[in-house]
């Protein structure tokens, strides 16, 4: 009845047919009746209707590329399922299923959907949000009232239909009884009416064909209604899923893109549904034409029945066969008139049903609700069942007429029995007249009911005017939506500008982080230099301690010698005769001492030569080391291009900071120990001064002491030169070590080959240091031996050496204080820079988290959009290659987006884990080292997203 749809060419000329709608079985019949006119006559063909339904069903989510490809027959963004279109609001807006089913159409977004859209995205102001919550409640009240009215009307119509069915059953029983009486009273005189019966049989065959076609069309419409119901269910499921997704993301800020394309899409949808309305009206007119043809066939049947009734009524005596035939035909005509009257009533009811369908159709355009669509479907099914029952009754009547005609051919021998039956029939005719009167009364009742229905139609027209006003309100809301779309577009542009500013700010922060890491590296190098200086000072302090110990031993030897000399002086005073022998022994001792001094000079010259040779060898080794360092520098310059990420460097800095703090603690403890040792040495020096004062009281050895002082000064000069040379070599070594440390910072991230080279270099430098320390120890031992031998004869030189040692100790203390001050300043600067670094890292983390969140939201929106498109393409149940290729392409895009989403979530989880580790490490270090500088943390915040994440410009576009 309303599901026969046929194809018409697209605006571009490519015919497309809805894949879900089965083809009408009345195609050939309708073509013959319409004369092949697709849209020229009063009614459009079903192909035109179906093609227009398919042509206007392609309004999906519009993109920039859709404007270029509208003329094509492939639909990558929308679907083509029986006049339906899927409109998705961007970022989790409510999905509305709009369709053009037979006599059920929806125009664009419904008012409730528009308001729900504004409810979801209307969080820009409190008053606007409150207003958006008030409007849907009013509309719900209006909708509920209209639904209640429609339900009441439907109940009344159902009651009327039940009454009509009962009346038809009663009339069918009456007609059956009359037909039985006609069969019993039939006579063979009606052989004359065979020609009429043949015509009637031809008409009946035509009517049967029409009834069969109408029955097939009813089945076809039931199939279409079931398909539409399935699509409605799937669309509701999709709406439910998308509403859940939008509800899950309701707490987050949305990026609404209600642009001009969306507004154009809504206008196109509105125009499409207006055209669908026009087509549905055409289908209704076509159905009215079909009803008129059925009326004509029923009128023809009524005429034949009237003739039969007149013939029956005209039957009287057997001698008056013609009069009897006329009477029978008259009675048959009366029965047919009753049937025609009932059919007229049926036609009126069908017209009323059509008007009600139009009204419901208009209401469904304004407010397409699933409850209304269900109610309309139930009404349609009821009407279909009513039509089917009427058609069955008509078939029964036709069968009875044929049986009457067949039974009309009787033999002349049975005429007497028929005369008796005619008398019985006359009695029955009286009964039929009374029944006719009752039917007339019932007709008057039906007329009163028709008046009531007219009043209902007037109320429905009033409601239609209200709906028009509602449409005007919707137009005003559309204009408001356009303004809001422009505002949202400006906000989107502003957000994009903010994103660009944040990216530039992130780049600046990364540059600042790199500069700070470089400054931190330089400060770490300075701290290492300080540590090296502290080590040198410790070595000097150790040498001085050894010298002091040697001097103490020499003082003890001198004390013993003094006691011996005193004993000798006493022996000389007691025994003057032994003076000559004592002088001889003294001269021999002096000669022995001179020989010993000469031997010591020769040994010192040999040691000097050996020392010079070793110094030259050390210089050669230093040159070789410098050449190797230059080669390593060349390799480093070649490999500096591969130094991209600073994580390992930051972790090495953190470990170095921890080691540095531990070394500083150990150095502070060592300095305190050295202070205590210096105090002890000062006390010992005081004792030595007292002993020297006692030794100066002896004037006999003054000349000898002067000579020994000269020799000691000469030896001191030589030792000073050697010490200066050693210091120069140590400075060279420090420079080499500083260069090595600077290079170690860069070499830490290079390959294992450079690491092995640097390990070998470190070993060589350590060996060189060890050799130099051994050389220093040898020189110190030689000097100590020389000084011991000198101090065995010279007491005055001890005082000078002790003064030199005190001066050296004071210098080392001053240098230690200076290094402590420098260390404190560097620690403060490092703490400040590390705090600045921590702030920069926190800002960078926050910005990275915001960017990752925005990218995840964009990916989720894109994935949900792809899922919706895939589901709608799969629901279309089309086996065309184009749709399958579109589904496969959408699935590939969805897989790619899901892969990107997984990468984003992994990066975000990694960033969160790094933040947790950094915070935990910072808290632990701050808890255990509250009075010290916190070490540099690993630079996990420098983690950048993978290049795959930056390939998502399509999402941000």
Swiss-Prot record:
- What residue stretch is flagged as signal peptide? none
Any GO CC annotation of this UniProt entry: synapse
Return the Low complexity bias intervals. 14-25
Q: Where is this region: Disordered?
A: 1-44, 918-957
Query: Which UniProt keyword terms apply here?
Result: Cell projection, Coiled coil, Cytoplasm, Cytoskeleton, Phosphoprotein, Synapse
What are the Phosphoserine sites (modified residues) in this protein? 65, 666
One Gene Ontology term of the molecular function aspect: protein-containing complex binding
The cross-references to Pfam families, in alphabetical order and at most eight, read: Cast (PF10174)
**Tissue expression:** Predominantly expressed in brain, including hippocampus, cortex, cerebellum, amygdala and olfactory bulb.
Compositional bias segments (type: Polar residues) = 1-13
Bias category Basic residues: which stretches?
A: 922-943
Q: Where do Acidic residues bias regions lie?
A: 948-957
Q: Where is this region: Involved in binding to RIMS1?
A: 760-957
Where in the cell is the protein located? Cytoplasm; Synapse; Presynaptic active zone; Cytoplasm, Cytoskeleton
Biological process terms in GO annotation: maintenance of presynaptic active zone structure; regulation of calcium-dependent activation of synaptic vesicle fusion; regulation of presynaptic cytosolic calcium ion concentration; synapse assembly; synapse organization; synaptic vesicle priming
Question: Which stretches are annotated as coiled coil?
Answer: 140-917
> Per its database record, what is this protein's job?
Thought to be involved in the organization of the cytomatrix at the nerve terminals active zone (CAZ) which regulates neurotransmitter release. Seems to act together with BSN. May recruit liprin-alpha proteins to the CAZ.
Quaternary structure per UniProt? Interacts with BSN, ERC1, PPFIA1, PPFIA2, PPFIA3 and PPFIA4. Interacts through its C-terminus with the PDZ domain of RIMS1. Part of a complex consisting of ERC2, RIMS1 and UNC13A.
The record's listing under PANTHER family reads:
ELKS/RAB6-INTERACTING/CAST PROTEIN, ERC PROTEIN 2
Q: What is this protein called?
A: ERC protein 2
């Amino acid at each position: 009845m309303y599901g026969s749809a046929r194809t018409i060419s697209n605006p571009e000329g490519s015919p497309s047919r809805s894949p879900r709608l089965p083809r009408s079985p009345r195609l050939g019949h309708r073509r013959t009746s319409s004369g092949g006119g697709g849209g020229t006559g009063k009614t459009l063909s079903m192909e035109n209707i179906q093609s227009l339904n398919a042509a206007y069903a392609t309004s999906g989510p519009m993109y920039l590329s859709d404007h270029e490809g509208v003329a094509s027959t492939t639909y990558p963004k929308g679907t083509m399922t029986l006049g339906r279109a899927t409109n998705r609001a961007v970022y989790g807006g409510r999905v509305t299923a709009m369709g053009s089913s037979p006599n059920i159409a929806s125009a664009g977004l419904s008012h409730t959907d528009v308001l729900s859209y504004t409810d979801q995205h209307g969080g820009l102001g409190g008053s606007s949000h409150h207003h958006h919550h008030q409007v849907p409640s009013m509309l719900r009240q209006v909708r509920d009232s209209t639904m209640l009215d429609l339900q009441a009307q439907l109940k009344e119509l159902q009651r009327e239909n039940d009454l009509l069915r009962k009346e038809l059953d009663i009339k069918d029983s009456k007609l059956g009884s009359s037909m039985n009486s006609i069969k019993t009273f039939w006579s063979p005189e009606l052989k004359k009416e065979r020609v009429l019966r043949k015509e009637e049989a031809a008409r009946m065959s035509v009517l049967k064909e029409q009834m069969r076609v109408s029955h097939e069309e009813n089945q076809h419409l039931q199939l279409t209604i079931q398909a539409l119901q399935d699509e409605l269910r799937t669309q509701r499921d999709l709406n439910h899923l998308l509403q859940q997704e939008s509800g899950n993301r309701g707490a987050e800020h949305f990026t609404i893109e209600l642009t001009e394309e969306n507004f154009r899409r809504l206008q196109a949808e509105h125009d499409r549904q207006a055209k669908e309305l026009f087509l549905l009206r055409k289908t209704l007119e076509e159905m009215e034409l079909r009803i008129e043809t059925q009326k004509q066939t029923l009128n023809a049947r009524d005429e034949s029945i009237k003739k039969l009734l007149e013939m029956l009524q005209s039957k009287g005596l057997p001698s008056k066969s013609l009069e009897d035939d006329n009477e029978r035909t008259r009675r048959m005509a009366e029965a047919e008139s009753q049937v025609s009257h009932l059919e007229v009533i049926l036609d009126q009811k069908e017209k009323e049903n059509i008007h009600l369908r139009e009204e419901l159709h208009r209401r469904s355009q304004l407010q397409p609700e699933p409850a209304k669509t269900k109610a309309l479907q139930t009404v349609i099914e009821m009407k279909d069942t009513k039509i089917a029952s009427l058609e069955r009754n008509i078939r029964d009547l036709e069968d009875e007429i044929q049986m009457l005609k067949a039974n009309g051919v009787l033999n002349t021998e049975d005429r007497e029995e028929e005369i008796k039956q005619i008398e019985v029939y006359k009695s029955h005719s009286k009964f039929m007249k009374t029944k006719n009167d009752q039917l007339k009364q019932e007709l008057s009742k039906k007329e009163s009911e028709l008046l009531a229905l007219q009043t209902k139609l007037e109320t429905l027209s009033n409601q239609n005017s209200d709906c028009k006003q509602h449409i005007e309100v919707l137009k005003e809301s559309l204009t408001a939506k356009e303004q809001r779309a422009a505002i949202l577009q400006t906000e989107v542009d502003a957000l994009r500008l903010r994103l660009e500013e944040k990216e530039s700010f992130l780049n600046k922060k990364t540059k600042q982080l790199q500069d700070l890491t470089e400054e931190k590296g330089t400060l770490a190098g300075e701290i290492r230099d300080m540590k090296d200086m502290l080590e040198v000072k410790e070595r000097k302090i150790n040498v001085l301690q050894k010298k002091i110990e040697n001097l103490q031993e020499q003082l003890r030897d001198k004390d013993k010698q003094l006691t011996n000399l005193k004993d000798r002086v006493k022996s000389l005073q007691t025994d003057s005769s032994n003076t000559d022998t004592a002088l001889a022994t003294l001269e021999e001792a002096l000669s022995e001492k001179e020989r010993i001094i000469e031997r010591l000079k020769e040994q010192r010259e040999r040691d000097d030569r050996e020392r010079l040779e070793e110094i030259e060898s050390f210089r050669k080794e230093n040159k070789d080391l410098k050449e190797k360092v230059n080669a390593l520098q060349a390799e480093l310059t070649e490999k500096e291009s591969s130094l991209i990420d600073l994580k390992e460097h930051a972790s090495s800095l953190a470990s170095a900071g921890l080691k540095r703090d531990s070394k500083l603690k150990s150095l502070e403890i060592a300095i305190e120990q050295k202070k205590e040792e210096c105090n002890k040495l000062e006390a010992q020096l005081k004792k030595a001064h007292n002993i020297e004062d006692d030794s100066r009281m002896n004037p006999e050895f003054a000349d000898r002491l002067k000579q020994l002082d000269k020799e000691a000064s000469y030896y001191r000069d030589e030792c000073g030169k050697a010490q200066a040379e050693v210091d120069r070599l140590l400075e060279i070594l420090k420079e080499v070590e500083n260069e090595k440390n600077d290079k170690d910072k860069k070499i830490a991230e290079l390959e294992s080959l450079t690491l092995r080279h640097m390990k070998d270099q470190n070993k060589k430098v350590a060996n060189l240091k060890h050799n130099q320390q051994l050389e220093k120890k040898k020189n110190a031992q030689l000097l100590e031996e020389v000084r011991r031998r000198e101090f065995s004869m010279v007491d005055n030189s001890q005082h000078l050496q002790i003064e030199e040692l005190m001066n050296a100790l004071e210098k080392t203390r001053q240098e230690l204080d200076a290094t402590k001050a420098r260390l404190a300043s560097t620690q403060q600067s490092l703490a400040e820079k590390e705090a600045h670094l921590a702030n920069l890292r926190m800002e960078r983390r926050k910005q990275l988290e915001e960017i990752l969140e925005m990218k995840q939201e964009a990916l989720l929106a894109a994935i949900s959009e792809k899922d919706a498109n895939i589901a709608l393409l799969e629901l279309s149940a089309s086996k065309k290659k184009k749709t399958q290729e579109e589904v496969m392409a959408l699935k590939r895009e969805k897989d790619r987006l899901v892969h990107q989403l997984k990468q984003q979530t992994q990066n975000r989880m990694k960033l969160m884990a790094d933040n947790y580790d950094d915070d935990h490490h910072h808290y632990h270090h701050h808890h255990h080292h509250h009075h010290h500088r916190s070490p540099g943390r690993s630079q996990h915040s420098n983690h950048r997203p993978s290049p795959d994440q930056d390939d998502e410009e399509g999402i941000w576009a």
